Amino acid sequence: ALGAALEAEFIDIFTDVGGIMTADPRVVEDAQILLKTTYNEICNLAQQGAKVIHPRAVEIAMQYNIPIRVRSTFSEFSGTLITNQSEIDEQRSGGNASSLTGITQTSNIAQFTINSDLTYSLQNELFSKLEEAHISLDLINITQQAVGFTVKTDTADKVSSILDTLELKYSKRSDVAKISLVGAAMTGVPGVVNKVVNTLYSKEIPILQTTDSHTTIWVLVPEECSTNAIRALHQAFELHKPITH
């Protein structure tokens, strides 16, 4: 906000790391520093768990079109440049096989699947009660046979109580993690989801649920498999290769 008020040419954010990385280096040893990426991608990464920068800071910079440089306090390295101008097209033409920018993980998630025959009025009552209880839902999946969603584990007991009150049949799983794969370059690219599925199945990692948007794919996996899932996907999309442009 200060950079926007001062009409700054750049906003420099100094941290204890060299820039924004393709994954958490504590989980993936060969995670790479992103040299240049877009506001939207970093916003998505931050919202999905990346800790280096707050999503609101990126939103303000994007609103005023001010590039952000995320750099280390202890190095002269240029770090990560966040701007409207992405190098994704150049990376594609240069043979970079990755259509992803980064991978993050969110833990402490509970998954609910409601198997009762839900009429429209019952669905409406359910979601109204969840809203009244200030329970935020994620990964919502509604079909004719079932309704599924995830919540933070600290609200799972409240959800169970509401479902019990409505006398709904449901299953709950509390030991799950959400893997988020972010990348503007995967928009319209065939085979991305197939690669995700094949990579996880090849490592015998169960996929509990998936959903996607234009720039993000979310995969729900058992918590105990999350580290192996991130490492396998990071390798499969070649995010471990040094970024040179």
Label each residue range with its predicted role:
Residues 1-212, 216-245:
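C-terminal catalytic "cap/lid" subdomain
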